[in-house]
Amino acid sequence: MRKDFGAKPYTYPQPVLMIATYGEDGKPDVMNAAWGGISDDKEISICVSENHKTTENILKKGAFTVSMADVEHMTACDYVGIVSGNKEPDKFEKAGFTAEKSDKVDAPIIKELPICVECKLKSYDKETCRLIGEIVNVSVDES
């Protein structure tokens, strides 16, 4: 038996999106986003409030990467979603992640995660918290 829910934005299950940036000091930062997805051929949309360290970095640097969490790294991915970069500046390293500089955008690739979408900031709406990135490249670990 099915239950109707009406017109809702349900596209579950969703991947856990890991948003990575560099701070002004060059340190990598990462958080997980509760909502996001592909919104056009070369566009990704993510809802992130402006009080996140990661959002601040994106607005200053104009770039970010989006990696997909995997089962092997779920604990680390959960950790960076719970701990604030404003309070714990070394959370990227404490999670056990290794940063590799993207040669396409000014943002880190998380070496441990298999898929990375490299993006340039296209727009950010403070009212709706909607961040839109232009997809510049997608890299996949072949191992």
PLM regions and their residue ranges:
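Active-site-proximal mixed secondary-structure blocks
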Residues: 1-31, 37-143
